[in-house]
A protein has these predicted regions:
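Surface-exposed extracellular loop regions of Gram-negative outer-membrane beta-barrel proteins
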Residues: 258-262, 266-273, 317, 439-450, ...
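Outer-membrane beta-barrel signature, preferentially recognizing the C-terminal barrel domain
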Residues: 273-300, 405-411, 457-466, 470, ...
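Short acidic/polar hinge/loop motifs at secondary-structure boundaries
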Residues: 114-143
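Extracytoplasmic beta-strand/coil segments of soluble accessory domains associated
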Residues: 40, 72, 76-116
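Gram-negative outer-membrane beta-barrel transporters
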Residues: 354, 359, 365, 423-429, ...
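Transmembrane beta-barrel wall of Gram-negative outer-membrane proteins
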Residues: 183-213, 223-264, 283-298, 359, ...
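Signature of Gram-negative outer-membrane beta-barrel scaffolds
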Residues: 362-478, 502, 596
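Flexible loop and strand-edge segments within Gram-negative outer membrane beta-barrel domains
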Residues: 229, 247-304, 316-343
Length: 723
């Protein structure tokens, strides 16, 4: 496939382009500027200027104005934060921050962690796509390692989702609501969501429902797509918030989500391993239930000023069925496959804060305890039917089904942290220390032990201490710089420790690794922030070194006893990721100018090759106009992405998506006092392009490439009624 001329965006060019496209700014501090408050960095509310890290905040209003309906839309204008894709069938796997993704990024909804991602082969993929864009109040993204507060699962960062409280909908009254209907041309999808807030600040209820139905995404490179994908997702949200007689607050929440997707993957037929396949269809079901109870307590002057205790339970249940008809094979067969994945998470969390002040200094002390259990069960089944004789067998490629890829496993994580924020004069010093203990306990699983008699079950007990130290210096009332060091930690996952696979037909075998070590990271962030009357700017330079990075299914060589080619999860010596993040905004009368930029480079120090999880440089620029009465607005967004060339191709040549510039136009129009009409035109120039995260690992001649291109010019529209 020929490569189009790409954009050449160096880090300096990225930032320079943004500066040149914005009008000059006079740096004048404004003490009255409303400061942005975030929770994710310290688990309590703080001004973003009191945090020694880079945090991105996305609000419900912003997502509505951008007509976001999926997790792919949520982060499309946040350089350095990407969705991880799994082809036309499975959709979004997870979220990537600064080149680190998968289960190394903690995703929490109302403080509750979401289930893990796990995949094996081409027909089994338990994704983490459980975030419903229709029921988000705001999203906070903490860039970089965050193990000092969040433990083993946050070595790559944190994505914290908050659903609406009743007060977010009720306002000053006793009831309120929000109804939103959105249609998108690119996948012919409809999303309807309704949020209702009842009560007041002392006793309130949020009730929300969201329903989304859509089809395959149109591809600009394959206008007559062979693939089809029909999806349906429904989500229910209930949240009760009540104050007791002591002035403390109780919260109880329930989220239920279920999704069903039918896919026809005809684009893969007739080539490679599917050269004899005449039909390939998927039937996938997903369900997630989350229960959360929290108690916010305390009063100034007591032994603690404030605190929150939380208990939660979450279960994810995924079932994926595949029909693989091989009508052109020497012996035509119809193969039915089943993949099932279930994970239960239950946990307790306690966070306490105390303020201490003297004439010259102020301390904010934090103390936290975490307890979390996960139980994970997975299996695959298969049945091959001779299309001529009707004869059936459960042996496929030498594998005898049903089977597990790892035993039923339980993990226990216990963590405790202490944090002190010391302020004196223009200086703030933040020191934190967390201790973690991790236990992996595989069960004596009869199915697993029968399938893999060569495997020895691996039990693990790991512990680590994660320090963090940050310094903030306020140069002026509106300007500050910060420097932070943070240590990250990730215990060996259950799947990597005990992964097993045995395919006699191809003569290879994957075996457990009892010697896996915990991953660790040491990250440094140097940042600058400025906040003016109607303008702001941020710049962050980061460098993170990862040691003992776990790579799944590393080739070991031939086993002299069995003659099989062996694979095993292994620790890499060292990898490094470093880069720059920047953002800015300027308001001049009716016009606004904003932008953000990202550049990163990742290197595997074992072979000095690039990391393929680190995407290309990117810059996002925006120009907006609002009428004097603020009832009408226009926004033009441009996304400039460089060609993706810094990659490891030692295992074979990879497809190189060209650089591209994409322009989107949005209109917001108020109709009356309670209704808002929004419309969007996407990819105005009808550009054919690929997102890097959609085509990772694919060769230049992969037949599925045309079907993974983004949509050409498309439209979307929404109608929003609130009261």
């Amino acid at each position: 496939m020929p490569e189009k001329a790409g954009l050449m965006l160096t880090p300096i060019a990225l930032i320079a382009a943004g500066v040149l496209l914005c009008p000059p700014v006079v740096v004048v501090a404004d003490d009255a500027t409303i400061e942005q408050i975030v929770v994710v960095a310290h688990k309590d509310e703080r001004s973003i200027r009191d945090i020694a890290a880079n945090v991105t905040v996305l609000s419900r209003a912003q997502l509505n104005d951008e007509l976001a309906t999926s997790i792919n839309d949520v982060f499309r204008y946040v350089p350095g934060v990407d969705h991880e894709a799994a082809g036309n069938r499975f959709g979004t796997e997870g979220i990537n921050i600064r080149g680190i993704g998968g289960n190394r990024v903690a995703i929490v909804v109302d403080g509750v962690p979401l289930s893990d991602h796990f995949s094996v082969g081409s027909f089994s993929n338990a994704t983490r796509d459980f975030i419903d864009a229709g029921l988000i109040e705001n999203i906070e993204v903490l860039h970089g390692p965050a193990s000092a507060l969040y433990g083993s699962s946050a070595i790559g960062g944190v994505v914290a989702v908050k659903t609406p409280d009743p007060v977010d909908l009720v306002g000053a009254g006793r009831n309120g609501g929000d109804l939103l209907v959105t249609w998108r041309d690119l996948d012919d999808s409809f999303q309807s969501q309704a949020l209702l807030g009842l009560g007041d600040r002392s006793l309130g209820l949020t009730a929300g429902v969201s329903w989304r139905s859509g089809h395959e995404v149109d591809s600009a490179a394959a206008p007559d797509s062979l693939d089809t994908r029909d999806s349906d997702r429904r989500t229910l949200l209930l949240k009760l918030v009540a104050d007791d007689q002591l002035g403390n607050t109780w919260r109880a929440g329930l989220i239920h989500q279920e999704a069903h997707t039918l896919s026809d993957l005809s684009s893969m037929l007739g080539s490679g391993r599917y050269r004899s396949t005449t039909a390939l269809e998927g039937n996938d079901r997903y369900q997630m239930d989350l229960i959360n109870v929290a108690y916010e307590f305390g009063s100034p002057g007591a032994w603690v000023d404030s605190g929150v205790a939380r208990g939660y339970f979450e279960v994810a249940d995924i079932e994926q069925k595949t029909l693989d008809e091989r009508g052109n094979a020497g012996t035509p067969v119809s193969i039915d496959r089943l993949f099932a994945f279930e994970q239960e998470i239950r946990g307790l969390e306690l966070n306490l804060w105390k303020d201490l002040e003297s004439s010259r200094t102020a301390h904010r002390l934090g103390l936290g305890l975490d307890y979390r259990e996960r139980r994970t069960e997975e299996y695959r089944d298969g049945l091959s039917t001779n299309m001529d004789s009707g004869e059936q067998t459960n042996v496929l490629l030498g594998e005898v089904f049903p089977l597990r890829d790892f035993p039923i496993s339980s993990t226990t994580e216990i963590g405790a942290y202490v944090e002190d924020t010391l302020s004196f004069g223009d200086w703030t010093v933040i020191a934190a220390l967390r201790a973690d203990r991790f236990e992996l306990s595989p069960s004596q699983d009869p199915m697993y032990l029968e399938d893999y008699p060569f495997a020895e079950l691996v039990s693990l007990t790991e512990s680590d201490v994660s320090p963090k130290l940050g310094v903030i210096y306020k140069i002026t009332p509106g300007t500050d710089i910060y420097l932070q060091y943070s240590h990250g930690f990730r215990a060996p996952p259950y799947a990597d420790a005990n992964i097993s696979l045995d395919v006699p037909l191809f003569n290879f075998r994957a075996i457990p690794n009892p010697d896996l070590k915990s991953e660790s990271s040491d990250g440094f962030d140097l940042g600058f922030r400025w906040q003016g009357v109607a303008s702001s700017a941020r710049l962050s330079v980061f460098h993170t070194r990862y040691e003992d990075f776990i790579e799944s299914k590393v080739r070991l060589g031939i086993d002299p006893e069995s003659g099989r080619l062996l694979f095993q999860s292994q620790n890499l010596d060292e990898t490094r990721i470093e880069g720059i993040e920047a953002s800015w905004s300027v308001r001049r009368g009716a016009f606004g100018f904003d932008g953000s930029a990202y550049y990163a480079r990742g290197v595997n120090k074992e072979n000095n090759e690039h990391l393929n999880s680190v995407g290309p440089p990117q810059i996002v620029l925006g120009v907006s106009w609002d009428s004097k009465d603020e009832r009408r607005g226009l926004r033009l967004k441009s996304t400039l992405t460089d060609g993706w060339s810094d990659r490891d191709e030692t295992s074979g040549e990879l497809f190189k998506p060209a650089g591209h510039a994409v322009f989107d136009l949005f209109l917001t129009q108020e109709i009356g006092s309670r209704t808002i009409l929004r419309a969007g035109l996407h990819n105005l120039t009808d550009r054919t392009y690929w997102n890097w995260s959609d085509i990772r690992g694919l060769s230049p001649n992969d037949p599925i490439l045309p079907y993974l291109a983004q949509a050409g010019r498309s439209a979307s529209v929404s109608l929003n009624v609130n009261w």
